[in-house]
């Protein structure tokens, strides 16, 4: 029962958060930070219909058992990657949650070699590991010291746990690297 209440709460928060409009200032700040380099871009995977979480009995190592990207999600991911390239934004490293919808989003962005990172795994599904995963993600962001940017494709609940922002599908929240606070500096919702 407790798990169901938690899932409903996270779902409601997610719906509230996706109704937010990304303002021009937040987008301008995000572009400026990414052009300067040394930041982390936390991206929620592109559109993956079918509800919340994953179907019962899903396995991380079997995409057929998970929620996957829709055709719209696949097209959106490719468009977002093209837009980032057009704007001259590059990433030194691209990390992804091990969930297929995140890996597929990262690959369709076509912004570099994609490496899976378990600490960005879905904190809703792995709720018993939420604190450890979030702490690991904060540490990973804090460790980033590249002159370029780090891109992490993960889940909305993970971005929210790190930043307090519940992003829309495909939305990018840019945070300062080198700090374990994952402080947001801007947001991009590209179409």
Where are these regions (language model features)?
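Positively charged n-region of N-terminal signal peptides that target proteins for export
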Residues: 1-5
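Sec/Tat signal peptide C-region and signal peptidase I cleavage site
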Residues: 18-23
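Active-site-proximal alpha-helix that buttresses catalytic centers in soluble enzyme cores
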Residues: 25-115, 123-127, 135, 165-191
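Generic beta-sheet signal
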Residues: 38-40, 146-154
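A short, structured loop/turn motif at beta-sheet edges
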Residues: 143-148, 177-178
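A short, acidic, amphipathic alpha-helical segment used as a generic capping/interface helix at domain edges
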Residues: 134-144
């Amino acid at each position: 029962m407790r798990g169901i209440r938690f899932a409903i709460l996270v779902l409601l928060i997610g719906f509230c958060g996706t109704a937010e409009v990304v303002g021009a200032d937040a987008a301008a700040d995000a572009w400026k930070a990414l052009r300067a380099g040394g930041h982390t871009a936390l991206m929620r995977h592109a559109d993956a219909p079918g509800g919340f979480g994953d179907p019962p009995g899903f396995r991380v190592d079997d995409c057929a058992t998970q929620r996957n990207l829709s055709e719209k999600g696949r097209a959106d991911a490719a468009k977002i990657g093209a837009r980032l390239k057009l704007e001259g934004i590059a990433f030194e490293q691209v990390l992804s949650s091990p969930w297929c919808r995140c890996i597929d989003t990262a690959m369709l962005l076509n912004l570099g070699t994609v490496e899976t990172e378990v600490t960005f795994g879905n904190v809703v599904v792995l709720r018993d590991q939420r604190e450890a995963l979030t702490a690991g993600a904060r540490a990973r962001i804090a460790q980033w010291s590249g002159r370029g940017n780090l891109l992490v494709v993960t889940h909305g609940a993970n971005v929210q746990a790190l930043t307090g922002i519940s992003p829309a599908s495909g939305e990018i929240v840019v945070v300062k690297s080198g700090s374990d606070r994952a402080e947001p500096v801007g947001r991009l919702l590209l179409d």
